A protein has these predicted regions:
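Transmembrane beta-barrel wall of Gram-negative outer-membrane proteins
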Residues: 181-184, 198-323, 327-347, 756
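C-terminal beta-signal and adjacent terminal beta-strands/loops
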Residues: 594, 664, 721-731, 754-811
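Extracytoplasmic beta-strand/coil segments of soluble accessory domains associated
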Residues: 45, 65, 74-123
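Outer-membrane beta-barrel transmembrane domain signature of Gram-negative proteins
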Residues: 325-338, 357, 372-478, 672-705, ...
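Outer-membrane beta-barrel signature, preferentially recognizing the C-terminal barrel domain
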Residues: 274, 333-335, 450-462, 508, ...
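Gram-negative outer-membrane beta-barrel transporters
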Residues: 584, 589-731
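A beta-strand signature from Gram-negative outer-membrane beta-barrel systems
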Residues: 120, 134-186
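N-terminal Sec signal peptide and the immediately downstream disordered periplasmic leader
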Residues: 1-70, 74-79, 141-144, 212-217, ...
Length: 811
């Protein structure tokens, strides 16, 4: 594979710095240390440098450039944040449609996402087939429009006492554009152009078109405004599959063998069409108060890959597919958030009262499929299920500044009420039916539909009260203290707290540290989601595989217990340094201990299970079962380094940024097999090798990046080098066959040149992964007989080099 050398990287940086200069101009994407932050503190004048915990600030310009591939916010965050992982999925069920993200190597549901400081809802779809994020319902970052963003603040520390459940790894706060006097039109087009080594062929695919517009207007003379925006995206599919060697367990018939050497599978991004819309507004109603509202809407139709079905396999009828077929999953994703409130000042107090409604609806479909048990008359299109999650939040925040004990204190208190609702609905009857052909698999191929017995309808209320105070003791010492009481209708009460402090020993050097305890309550989907797969055994008897709710009586009899909240204890210690106006550096060490991490159990299988369920519940043919459980206690230790150097050079402004992150997760304790299962079979294991691998080393532990940005009146030149650390994949196929592969570290080089034609027009060309680098090829035991030569674990992905052009008009 291609690997960039240091000389190649050096040439790229030199090229970015050698352009002709016209005049000095501030780098549009540069984040300065005097940027005032609003995340993680009550103080209204804290800057990035003065924060008691690490906070990254990403500007709209940073995000716009980094998200040029597919117009994805998640991809932009991965490019810009070394502790953020956003792997590309393929052949991974629901994860092909809603990608999960990690912060500090932790689970996707252990990071809290805010929009304008208000809690963002999660997706409705449970990831049960992916590696990263298995068993979670993550926030869908790609449902947030890129052109709506003013900046993003990323708090890299536990913040449950300040923001509530989920903020174990940190908080990502998306601040929306509030400049009504600037409008913008933008369009871009790009595609992958790459050498696909497994097929020895150069390929151009993944053509992506993106268009956006936003416009605003002032409302009155008192600071009111209204701003609205729209994005349209269209992405064609990519494919990096290899040549099929025909698995030996398939029928070795002439029709099947005739497909050898062809590309029957797909490995890559699915086709996507999407629309994003947003608004942001405020209207003063008095000299000291204003109404505000904002919202986002996402409508996205996606496709996902699935394994090929051979012509003479039992999953096919040649009357329908004479040459075999590959089912295509379709996702219909609809996402909405709308927030309205009032804020202002009453006497010495600032207030903010709001209502926040968020909802995600996901419909899962299959086409180019069939239900083989229904015979050659089977339909080929199915709806396999509907999923919905809704969240309503009411907040009241009060803040007051006062002086006492020789210090300035910003005291905040408030209350929050949250209602969550989760529902699933069965798919088409044909998607889960067991037809008359008992020698054929049942249900729609590539995932049987939810049946009526799987349907869920859950809701709960959550109430909380909180208080925090940010204090400034002179010029050197500052603190943040927070406490929160949270009561869950289904889990009872939880207390969280946080103490953070910073001391400046000199203008150029300060120490900071924090300790906090945090909580993540089990999601409603982890509590109530169920799914059933059906089939026939060799004797033609109906069989079932069940993913069971922990409240299902069968699961209880197999050792399931009520899920407990995940609880963490977070420690951090670091320093910040600023040397003049040119150089700043921060280094932070952290430890996160998490008890009772939630995961999906391994499949419980065998005749002992089948007989037990039949005898005790009268349900026949249950050949496998699984459920969610509090699987393990973990410890994550790591460090994060960020450095910036600014200099006027070569006739323009130069910004060099270097970052490094390290996070290693180890298992402290693993749940034992319950007595109920040991009585059935002493070899049963609930939390095994594969799930241990998912928590510990399936994601890279290290990440390093070096970026250079140079600009003057007409040019903005940027280059970025990323190094992604190694990741390990482990499969447990049973019978002692446990293939393992560690995929080595990879480098990625990105370049962009942008030219300003006057004050309004901007043209740009660029490339990402321009050296066309790929991850290591998978070994034979993992590559599925040549069909899947690359793994989805590496953040560099398996698409190769991407080239693009962009035009923007501002007014």
């Amino acid at each position: 594979m291609t690997r960039p050398t240091l000389s190649a990287i050096g040439l790229a940086v030199a090229a970015a710095l050698s352009a002709n200069a016209q005049a000095q101009q501030a780098a549009p994407g540069a984040t300065t240390l005097d940027t005032v932050i609003v995340t993680g503190t009550r103080a209204s004048d804290r800057t990035v440098l003065e924060s008691t915990v690490p906070v990254d600030v990403l500007t709209a310009e940073d995000i716009r450039k980094a998200g040029v591939v597919n117009g994805e916010l998640g991809s932009a965050l991965q490019a810009l944040l070394p502790s953020f992982n956003f792997p590309r999925q393929s052949n991974s069920g629901g994860a092909d449609h809603i990608r999960a993200a990690q912060l500090r190597g932790l689970s996707p549901d252990q990071v809290l996402v805010l929009v304008n400081g208000k809690r963002r809802h999660t997706s409705a779809l449970v990831n049960t087939d992916s590696k990263i994020g298995k068993g979670t319902t993550p926030v869908d970052f790609n449902s947030i429009p890129i052109n709506a963003i003013k900046r993003i603040e990323v708090l890299r520390d536990g913040a449950g006492a300040q923001y509530g459940s989920d903020a174990i790894a940190g908080v990502i706060n998306v601040i929306l554009d509030d400049n009504p006097e600037r409008g913008e039109l933008e369009a871009s087009f790009g595609a992958y152009n790459t050498d696909v080594e497994p097929i020895n062929r150069r390929v151009t695919d993944g053509q992506t078109s993106y268009a956006s517009a936003k416009v605003g207007t002032l409302l009155g003379d008192d600071g009111g405004f209204f701003k609205v925006g729209l994005e349209l995206k269209n992405r064609e599919a990519t494919n990096r599959a290899g040549f099929d060697q025909i698995p030996p367990f398939e029928e070795q018939t002439p029709a099947n063998l005739a497909l050898a050497g062809r590309r029957n599978y797909v490995l890559g991004d699915g086709a996507t069409k999407g629309l994003n819309a947003w608004l942001n507004t405020k209207v003063p109603f008095s000299a000291n108060g204003e109404f505000y509202a904002f919202g986002t809407y996402n409508q996205r139709d996606t496709e996902g890959a699935n394994y090929f079905r051979y012509p003479d396999g039992s999953a096919n009828w040649r009357e329908i597919y004479p040459n075999g077929y590959r089912p295509i999953s379709e996702g219909e994703n609809r996402d909405l958030q709308i927030v309205a409130g009032a804020r202002g000042q009453l006497g010495d107090w600032d207030y903010d009262a709001s209502v926040n409604y968020g909802r995600n609806d996901f419909t899962y479909r299959l086409r180019n499929s069939l239900n083989a048990s229904l015979g050659p008359g089977s339909t080929t299109r199915f709806k396999t299920g509907d999923f919905a999650f809704a969240q309503t939040v009411a907040n009241l925040d009060l803040t007051r500044v006062f002086d006492a004990a020789g210090a300035t204190h910003t005291f905040g208190t408030g209350a929050e009420f949250r209602r969550e609702q989760y529902r699933t609905h069965a798919g088409d009857p044909a998607s889960y039916a067991a037809g008359p052909f008992t020698d054929r698999p049942t249900g729609s191929q590539a995932g049987g539909g939810l049946s009526p017995q799987d349907e869920a309808d859950l809701s709960r209320n959550v109430a909380s009260a909180y208080a925090n105070v940010s204090s400034q003791f002179g010029d050197k010492f500052s603190t943040d203290l927070a406490g929160r009481y949270e009561h869950y209708q289904d889990f009872g009460s939880q207390w969280t707290g946080k103490l953070a402090a910073r001391y400046a020993f000199a203008p150029a050097f300060a120490l900071r540290g924090a300790v906090s305890n945090n909580v993540r309550a089990p999601s409603l989907s982890q509590i109530g989601y169920e799914a059933t797969s059906t089939g026939y055994d060799a004797a033609g008897r109906l069989t079932q595989g069940r993913l069971l709710s922990v409240y299902n009586p069968i699961a209880r009899a197999l050792g399931a217990t009520d899920l407990k909240p995940e609880k963490s204890l977070n420690y951090s210690l670091g320093f910040t340094s600023q040397l003049g106006d040119h150089f700043d550096l921060s280094l932070d060490f952290f430890q996160i201990d998490i008890d009772d991490r939630i995961a999906l159990s391994e499949d419980i299988t065998g005749t002992a299970l089948t007989d037990f369920v039949q005898q005790n519940f009268g349900v026949s043919g249950v050949q496998s079962a699984s459920y969610f459980l509090n699987a393990a206690d973990t410890r994550t230790r790591g460090a994060e380094l960020v450095g910036n150097w600014r200099q006027y050079a070569f006739g323009g402004d130069l910004l060099l940024t270097g970052t490094y992150s390290y996070a290693k997760t180890e298992l402290k304790n693993v749940i034992g097999t319950p007595a109920q299962l040991l009585a059935l079979d002493p070899d049963y294991v609930l939390f095994g090798i594969e799930e241990s691998n998912t928590l510990t080393d399936a994601a890279p532990r290290t990440r390093a990046a070096l970026a250079a940005n140079w600009n003057n009146e007409h040019w903005n030149l940027q280059t970025r080098v990323n190094r992604y650390g190694s990741a390990t994949r482990v499969f447990d196929f049973g019978g002692g066959f446990v293939p393992r592969q560690t995929y080595g570290a990879e480098w990625q080089l990105d370049l962009e040149a942008e030219y300003h034609l006057g004050a309004q027009w901007t043209l740009a060309i660029g490339g990402q992964n321009i050296l066309d680098n790929y991850s290591d090829r998978s070994i034979d035991d993992i590559a599925y007989f040549g069909n899947l030569p690359y793994d989805v674990l590496s953040p560099i992905g398996s698409n190769g080099a991407y080239w693009y052009g962009r035009v923007r008009y501002t007014f």
